[in-house]
Amino acid sequence: MKAPSDMKHYLQFKDFSAQEYAYLFERAAVIKGKFKRYEKHHPLTDRTLAMIFEKASTRTRVSFEAGMYQLGGSVVHLTTGDSQLGRAEPIEDSAKVISRMVDLVMIRTYEQTKIERFAAHSRVPVINGLTNEFHPCQILADIFTFIEHRGSIQGRTVAWVGDGNNMANTWLQAAELLGFTVHVSTPSGYEVDSRVAGVAAGSHYKVFSDPLEACRGADLITTDVWTSMGYEAENEARKKAFADWCVDAEMMAAARPEALFMHCLPAHRGEEVEADVIDGPQSVVWDEAENRMHVQKALMEYLLLGQVA
């Protein structure tokens, strides 16, 4: 397939402008409304999405696959086990071949450089479904969920409690672009690196050694698993290091009374979050999970059709 001359990829959160995000959030609300009213919405009829998974996933696969079908399109699912990607065939060659047969590619992999190499040789838009460095689709869903429940995120405070991982990196990019503040608290040795996120040191974020202080006055507290996929060998060491970085009722009480709790899932109750928090009244994790599908539908529509009325 051949995309328009103004083709865009979505590899990091900072790939889009604040104006584009404003459109995507509005469009996601419209698309979600149609879904809730059982209205058919098939702008991508006869379009095909290729999903390439080097890292396995539940939510990423279901949200993209169901979303593309709901938009009227079709899906091809590939893993490194049943394709030549990154094995006998160079990534660049795979990109040149696959992008001649489909309209859109989503990749969930380990190294950010791998998806960037693929995109550099693709004739169609490429979406980052997750890498070790960034998770833009998840933060897109998180911010949309916040807007649904509390309005604009501009000027608000988000507390990130846990690992300085791909989620934390993406939150830093989002804060700089959309004008809010992130309080980051990680154990020693697991800090977020602003150079990876590509944001100015201290720009729109503050670092706290005490997770409770990071949560003080926050509008949103969010976290992730202590041991991400690919780091299983470090699991026991991480459990010891992260023991004080479990989001609990005391942290939620330190935040604003109307503060929300989010988690990208899967969650380990009793580790990064207590059960009474994730299953409590301030938690919006199930809306957050569903919204992956709606924002990604808006994203796919935008990448292929541009802004629509």
Swiss-Prot record:
What this protein is reported to do is described as: Reversibly catalyzes the transfer of the carbamoyl group from carbamoyl phosphate (CP) to the N(epsilon) atom of ornithine (ORN) to produce L-citrulline.
Q: Which InterPro entries match?
A: Asp/Orn_carbamoyltranf_P-bd (IPR006132), Asp/Orn_carbamoylTrfase (IPR006130), Asp/Orn_carbamoylTrfase_sf (IPR036901), Asp_carbamoyltransf_Asp/Orn-bd (IPR006131), Orn/put_carbamltrans (IPR002292), OTCase_ArgI (IPR024904)
Q: What PROSITE patterns does the entry give?
A: CARBAMOYLTRANSFERASE
For the ligand (carbamoyl phosphate), the binding residues are: S57, T58, R59, T60, Q84, R108, H135, P136, C137, Q138, C264, L265, R292
In this chain, L-ornithine is annotated as bound at N166, D224, S228, M229
UniProt lists the family membership as follows:
Belongs to the aspartate/ornithine carbamoyltransferase superfamily. OTCase family.
Which GO terms of type biological process are on file?
arginine biosynthetic process via ornithine; citrulline biosynthetic process; L-arginine biosynthetic process
Q: Tell me the organism.
A: Paracidovorax citrulli (strain AAC00-1) (Acidovorax citrulli)
The lineage's top-level taxon is Bacteria
A Pfam family found in this protein is OTCace_N
Q: Which HAMAP family match?
A: OTCase
One Gene Ontology cellular component annotation held by this UniProt entry: cytoplasm
Catalysed reaction equations from the record: carbamoyl phosphate + L-ornithine = L-citrulline + phosphate + H(+)
- EC id: 2.1.3.3
Give each disulfide bond as a residue pair.
none
Q: Where in the cell is it found?
A: Cytoplasm
MF terms from GO for this chain are: amino acid binding; ornithine carbamoyltransferase activity
Q: Which gene encodes it?
A: argF
Any keyword Cytoplasm? yes
Question: Which pathway, per its entry?
Answer: Amino-acid biosynthesis; L-arginine biosynthesis; L-arginine from L-ornithine and carbamoyl phosphate: step 1/3
What UniProt keywords apply to this chain's record, in alphabetical order?
Answer: Amino-acid biosynthesis, Arginine biosynthesis, Cytoplasm, Transferase
Q: What is this protein called?
A: Ornithine carbamoyltransferase
